[in-house]
Amino acid sequence: MIESTDADLAWLLPDEAATAALAAHMAGVLDDGLVLYLHGPLGAGKTSFARALLTALDVGERVKSPTYSLIEGYATRDRPAWHLDLYRIADPGELEWLGLDALADPAALVLVEWPERGAGALPTADLELLLGYAGQGRRASLRAFTAKGERLLARLAKY
């Protein structure tokens, strides 16, 4: 961890292995459902983080990028998980046919890349992860928006 405030945490991640380690740490302290919005430019590591988090939660199958399918569902060791990539969505109304009702399950892990493209159609984020370029590596910052997100942030602060 490189910095901390009451509302957020930040890390410098020198490589993809460090990104995967942060995701694995999150998986280890996750004890409830969570809605996590993933922000960052193309190639910043949103899908890599989501893939590492789902893998650490023992999905037991290859974690695919939902770039073309828009949504992929998984069963982790103790909860349903959904990974959405809304990059190709031009209007949130396009999400109506996806049947997003399952995302409201409080036990579910919901990972959303490009959430701004689904504004108004998505559940509220507990946490948001902002990934950006930092030299050859990445800078990751997490911000909490709910009590659930704040509890997870407190557990992650020990990383």
Cite the ranges covered by each PLM segment.
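Short hydrophobic/aromatic beta-strand immediately N-terminal to the Walker A/P-loop
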Residues: 35-37
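Conserved lysine of the Walker
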Residues: 46
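N-terminal pre-Walker A segment at the start of P-loop NTPase domains
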Residues: 2-25
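Short beta-strand-centered segment that lines the nucleotide-binding/catalytic pocket of NTP-utilizing
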Residues: 59-74
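Phosphate-binding P-loop
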Residues: 26-33
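Short phosphate-coordinating micro-motif centered on Lys-Gly-acidic
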Residues: 1-9, 55, 90-95, 101-159
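P-loop (Walker A) phosphate-binding loop of NTP-binding proteins
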Residues: 39-41
